[in-house]
């Protein structure tokens, strides 16, 4: 992993394609915490830790293949957050990417870590020529407020898009943000 420090001693590093098993397990613990905290990120509660480990193992394979970049925030020896960017493989869409799975441990929210992870992903995407990022997030969620404050543009809402961790169908909001060369043009 390569690192960039946000505020207050937390270090954000890019995940490589062969992390130690202990890191995959810590990332799984973060995923379980995020789901059990009510975030709608594709999983239902209770999320089994083994399923979370398996999901992260798949993400590591995607990182190794080059279709996904992941940044991990650590505070000392604890994993406290993560964010990913999925890169399309089609020739007509290589200018854009999708921001995915922004997670901050419940004990570490409200300290600017989500904003630091988001800024890291935006900057890194722009550095490799991405000019447009997009995402979807549960409408009305704390994450949506973060994206609004960070200058993302909401383009619409899809009703009953995905179930929250408790199985209730919730709407999602679609957002985009121009980055890199598109911002300075």
What positions do the PLM features span?
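Actinobacteria-biased recognition of intrinsically disordered, low-complexity terminal regions
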Residues: 1-8, 185
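Acetyl-CoA-dependent GNAT
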Residues: 10-101, 105, 118-120, 124, ...
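Short hydrophobic/aromatic beta-strand or adjacent loop that forms the aromatic wall/cage
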Residues: 68, 170-174
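Active-site acidic-Proline motif in GNAT/NAT acetyltransferases
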Residues: 105-107, 111
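Conserved GNAT acetyl-CoA-binding A-motif
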Residues: 118, 125-137
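Conserved catalytic-core motifs of GNAT/GCN5-like acyltransferases
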Residues: 134-136, 153-171
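Helix-turn-helix
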Residues: 143
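Conserved active-site tyrosine of GNAT-family acetyltransferases
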Residues: 147-148, 152
């Amino acid at each position: 992993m390569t690192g960039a420090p946000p505020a207050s001693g937390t270090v954000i590093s890019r995940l490589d394609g062969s992390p130690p098993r202990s890191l995959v397990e810590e990332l799984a613990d973060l995923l379980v915490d995020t789901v059990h905290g009510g975030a709608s990120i594709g999983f239902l509660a209770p999320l089994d830790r083994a399923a979370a480990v398996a999901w992260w193992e798949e993400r590591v394979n995607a990182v190794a293949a080059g279709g996904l970049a992941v940044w991990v925030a650590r505070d000392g020896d604890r994993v406290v957050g993560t964010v990913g960017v999925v890169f399309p493989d089609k020739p007509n869409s290589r200018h854009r990417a999708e921001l995915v799975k922004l997670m901050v441990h419940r004990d570490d929210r409200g300290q600017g870590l989500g904003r630091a992870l988001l800024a890291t992903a935006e900057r890194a995407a722009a550095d490799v020529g991405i000019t447009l990022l997009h995402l979807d997030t549960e409408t009305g969620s704390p994450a949506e407020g973060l994206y609004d404050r960070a200058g993302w543009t909401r383009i619409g809402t899809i009703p009953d898009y995905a179930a929250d961790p408790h199985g209730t169908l919730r709407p999602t909001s679609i957002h985009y943000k121009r980055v890199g060369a598109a911002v300075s043009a």
